[in-house]
Each structure stands twice: as structure tokens, then as C-alpha cells.
A protein has these predicted regions:
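Glycine-rich Rossmann-fold phosphate-binding loop(s) that bind the pyrophosphate
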Residues: 145-146
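An N-terminal-biased, well-structured beta-alpha scaffold segment characteristic
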Residues: 1-79, 193
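Gly/Ala-rich phosphate-binding loop of Rossmann-like dinucleotide-binding domains
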Residues: 153, 157
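Rossmann-like adenosine-cofactor binding region
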Residues: 40-45, 168-220
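Phosphate-coordination loops involved in phosphoryl transfer and adenosine-cofactor binding
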Residues: 1, 51, 136-139, 214
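N-terminal Rossmann-fold NAD(P) dinucleotide-binding loop
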Residues: 149-150
Length: 220
């Protein structure tokens, strides 16, 4: 029986599939052949001889010591794009939150609850504090047009935004998914100069370290 240790909470919908194929999936299995993780940091983990592979239920693998795994012949795999729709929705949600003080307005409404006849006057007086710009007509810069970035760019167009995208390594598959209305730019500086909002959709690597630095922020 193939033994898999889960080091984070994994949906039963996933673990049940493994169990149906004869795998033992538990958080306390000794010397498993596989690890299934999400956020667990394995950089200080001493790997055992039986370990064959590590699977991450997510896109990035920065919490896995890839060099060590390569030396020991441990296969590492992830799930790129699995969280793309959820992340796309959260990006738009965060832009809406940044445009208007929605959370503050919720707390303010709670604060005037129970004030009866005073509420209409309080609303009229206080509502202007929570006004904000629409996303429609604003400029969004998307850095990285992969599984997540392409979805963010396409959805932002539906909100009436002008979308510029930067990705010198865009795959053919991503290009097919991307709307023709996304403006492609060749330099990050154009994203920084023209954007009201920026969505950064790249993995953290040595090449992306300090991609957004003091100079980039100063040019915004």
C-alpha cells in the first residue's frame, strides 16, 4: 500500500480519490512514500529514504527545497491553475475594497443600528465618507499573464477597465485565453506609470525578487 502523509488540511474530495486507488492517506503515517502539503515549510525537514515524491495543493513551490529534492531524486509536483478562479475573484474584490471603504461602511452601519428616527439624517450626513471611484474607466496593469493573470485581465475588461499586460514569457496556451482587448506592453515601467491598480501574478524566484522595488513604487 502506498503511504501518503498530509502535512496540512486537504479536502476530503481529494484524499478520497487517493484512497480509492489503494493509498493510505493520514497525517501521522510513518516513513511515507509521499507528502501532500499546502503551506507546510519543508526547508528544515530531513527527508527519509522511502520518500519518493512531494505534492503541493497549490501553485507555488517556494516552501519546498527543490535543490535538495533534486539531489535525492524526490519528484516535486504542484497544481498550477487550481486556485486561478478563486484568486481572480479575490483580486477584483480587493480592487473594489480599495476603491471604497466598504468594510468601514459596514461597521458604520452597525454603529447607527437602533437609533430609530435618527437614522435617515445620520445616513444623509455620513454616507459621503464612503464614496469612491468606479473601476470602470480605470487602468489595470497585470504583471504575469498565466493561468491567473489572464483571468484577472479578462474579468477586469468586463468591469470597463483599460487593461495592460506584461509577460515576456507568455505561453501559447495563455495567449489563446487572453482577450484581444488587453494591451500588451514590453516594459514594466509602462505598467508602473499608467496603472491605477496593479495585479502581480508571478512566482517568487530569484529573477522576480525586488521586481517591485523603491524605484518602481516611485514611478507609480
Amino acid at each position: 500500500m502506498f503511504k501518503i502523509r498530509t502535512m496540512n488540511t486537504i479536502s476530503p474530495l481529494g484524499t478520497q480519490i487517493l484512497e480509492k486507488h489503494g493509498c493510505a492517506v493520514k497525517p501521522d503515517i510513518e516513513n511515507p512514500e509521499a507528502l501532500l502539503i499546502r503551506s507546510a515549510d519543508l526547508h528544515s525537514t530531513e527527508f527519509w529514504p522511502e520518500l519518493l515524491c512531494i505534492g503541493r495543493a497549490g501553485a507555488g513551490v517556494n516552501n519546498i527545497p527543490l535543490d535538495t529534492c533534486s539531489e535525492k531524486g524526490i519528484v516535486v509536483f504542484n497544481a498550477p491553475g487550481a486556485n486561478a478562479d478563486a484568486t481572480k475573484e479575490m483580486v477584483i474584490f480587493e480592487m473594489l475594497l480599495a476603491s471604497r471603504d466598504i468594510l468601514g461602511s459596514i461597521e458604520w452601519v452597525k454603529s447607527i443600528a437602533g437609533k430609530g428616527d435618527e437614522i435617515p439624517a445620520l445616513v444623509e450626513k455620513g454616507k459621503s465618507a464612503f464614496a469612491g471611484p468606479e473601476l470602470c474607466g480605470k487602468n489595470l496593469g497585470v504583471i504575469g499573464l498565466g493561468a491567473i493573470g489572464a483571468l484577472v485581465a479578462n474579468l477586469a475588461l468586463e468591469f470597463g477597465m483599460t487593461v495592460r499586460g506584461y509577460d515576456p514569457y507568455m505561453s501559447v496556451e495563455s495567449a489563446w485565453r487572453l482577450s484581444r482587448d488587453v494591451i500588451h506592453v514590453d516594459y514594466l515601467d509602462e505598467i508602473f506609470r499608467t496603472s491605477d491598480y496593479i495585479s502581480l501574478n508571478v512566482p517568487y524566484t530569484e529573477s522576480t525578487h525586488h521586481m517591485i522595488d523603491a524605484a518602481a513604487i516611485a514611478s507609480m
